[in-house]
Curated annotation (Swiss-Prot):
GO terms for molecular function: 2-C-methyl-D-erythritol 2,4-cyclodiphosphate synthase activity; metal ion binding. A divalent metal cation binds at D11, H13, H45. The keyword Metal-binding applies. It comes from Thermosynechococcus vestitus (strain NIES-2133 / IAM M-273 / BP-1). The gene is ispF. It catalyses: 4-CDP-2-C-methyl-D-erythritol 2-phosphate = 2-C-methyl-D-erythritol 2,4-cyclic diphosphate + CMP. Its cofactor is a divalent metal cation. Keywords: Isoprene biosynthesis, Lyase, Metal-binding. It is an enzyme of class 4 (lyase). NCBIfam families: ispF. Pfam families: YgbB (PF02542). This is 2-C-methyl-D-erythritol 2,4-cyclodiphosphate synthase. Its EC number is 4.6.1.12. InterPro entries: MECDP_synthase (IPR003526), MECDP_synthase_CS (IPR020555), MECDP_synthase_sf (IPR036571).
């Protein structure tokens, strides 16, 4: 009998000058980047939290705490691969992921397919198992004022097929 589990993830980071902007493992052209202990890739972080949440495994802060210097500047794709391994060790696999990135700028449409490709490769799944959408916050709140970028993700995990 097939079992399914669903997880939800969210992340937000502040935009600051002199940092690269990385979303979904792709470096984007922008004047500012996201501030964080790792590469601050909010999309990948939201996906990791959704995957971990689906199996009640906590959140990324539990596995990759910002207080631990080994994760300083870490590539979030490396962290995502570790999360994927945790899931596989427990007999689960990704059914699909649906994510939304919320940013006023830069416009994300040209980057969405490369992000899907990169994330699918890291997770070892087909590109059509990942949906990434982009929207703005209509100039409302910290994201609307271009102070940060946020991401939401939902992940479906399957076992027993």
């Amino acid at each position: 009998m097939m079992k399914i589990r669903i997880g939800n993830g969210y992340d937000i980071h502040r935009l600051v000058p002199e940092r690269p902007l990385i979303l979904g493992g792709i470096r984007l052209e922008h004047a500012c980047g996201l501030l964080g202990h790792s590469d601050a890739d909010v999309l990948t972080h939201a996906i990791m939290d959704a995957l971990l949440g689906a199996l009640s495994l906590g959140d990324i802060g539990h596995y990759f705490p910002p207080s631990d210097p080994q994760w300083a500047g870490a590539d979030s794709q490396v962290l995502l691969a570790k999360v994927a391994a945790l899931i596989a060790e427990r007999g689960w696999r990704v059914g699909n992921i649906d994510a939304v990135v919320v940013a006023e700028r830069p416009k994300l449409k040209p980057y969405l397919d490369p992000m899907r490709d990169r994330l699918a490769t890291t997770l070892g799944i087909d590109r059509d198992q990942i949906s990434i959408k982009a929207t703005t916050n209509e100039k409302l709140g910290p994201v609307g004022r271009e102070e940060g970028i946020a991401a939401y993700a939902v992940a479906l995990l399957q076992s027993g097929m």
